[in-house]
């Protein structure tokens, strides 16, 4: 167990929080993180591309000319793949690109990213993060008070916080159960609350 600096949302020191070594101090595994991101991106693919094979193309039921005696190559349908306007051979059909990954590897991936954020000093833990109303200006003031620069990923279940960050291109807010490997890697800073840390540790520790 390691003690980590705890801050309030105004950027002031609010004491310390204990981080579980099994979650925030594991040896980062880049290969597993890479596999997790590829899996996550594969699951987002639509997989709706489709072309027609010779049975799906309209027409072509009649043999274009008789089998023998014309001197031309034998043909059975004008919708065969060698014809212009014919069907496509082995073309794409609707499919799901999603695939599974062992639970231990999925958990190791997110733990690796969290540990790397801690190593790189890109992790910020707040005692709480709340807003009375969705105000982008107030949320920007919070980020400035915390001296956060670059792309910032904020973990919060507060609806006002989520709405306040919608217009900020370099800020993304996700609920604690929506924290994922790809977002954590793509954003420079990760902001968690004390309660979020406990919830994450309950699942991953």
Swiss-Prot record:
GO terms for cellular component: ribonucleoprotein complex; ribosome. Pfam families: Ribosomal_L4 (PF00573). It comes from the Bacteria. The keyword Ribosomal protein applies. GO terms for biological process: translation. Signal peptide: none annotated. GO terms for molecular function: rRNA binding; structural constituent of ribosome. The keyword Ribonucleoprotein applies. SUPFAM superfamilies: Ribosomal protein L4. InterPro entries: Ribosomal_uL4, Ribosomal_uL4-like, Ribosomal_uL4_dom_sf. Residues 51-71 have a biased composition (Basic residues). Residues 44-77 are annotated as: Disordered. Keywords: Ribonucleoprotein, Ribosomal protein, RNA-binding, rRNA-binding. Belongs to the universal ribosomal protein uL4 family. One of the primary rRNA binding proteins, this protein initially binds near the 5'-end of the 23S rRNA. It is important during the early stages of 50S assembly. It makes multiple contacts with different domains of the 23S rRNA in the assembled 50S subunit and ribosome. Part of the 50S ribosomal subunit. HAMAP family: Ribosomal_uL4_B (MF_01328_B). PANTHER family: 50S RIBOSOMAL PROTEIN L4, LARGE RIBOSOMAL SUBUNIT PROTEIN UL4M. This is Large ribosomal subunit protein uL4.
């Amino acid at each position: 167990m390691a003690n980590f600096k705890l801050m309030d949302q105004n950027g002031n020191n609010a004491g310390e929080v204990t981080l579980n070594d099994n979650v925030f101090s594991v040896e980062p595994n880049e290969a597993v993180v890479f596999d997790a991101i590829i899996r996550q991106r594969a699951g987002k693919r639509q997989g709706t591309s489709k072309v027609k094979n010779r049975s799906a193309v309209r027409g072509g039921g009649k043999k274009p000319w008789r089998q023998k005696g014309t001197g031309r190559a034998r043909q059975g349908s004008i919708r065969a793949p060698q014809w212009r306007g014919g069907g496509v051979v082995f073309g794409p059909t609707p499919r799901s690109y999603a695939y599974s990954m062992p639970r231990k590897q999925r958990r190791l991936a997110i733990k690796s990213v969290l540990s790397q954020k801690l190593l790189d000093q890109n992790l910020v833990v707040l005692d709480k993060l709340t807003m009375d109303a969705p105000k982008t200006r107030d949320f920007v003031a919070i980020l400035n008070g915390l001296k956060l620069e670059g792309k910032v990923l904020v973990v919060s279940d507060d609806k006002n916080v989520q709405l306040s960050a919608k217009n900020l291109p370099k800020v993304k807010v996700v609920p604690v159960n929506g924290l994922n490997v790809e977002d954590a890697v793509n954003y420079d800073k990760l902001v968690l609350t004390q309660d979020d840390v406990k919830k994450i540790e309950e699942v991953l520790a």
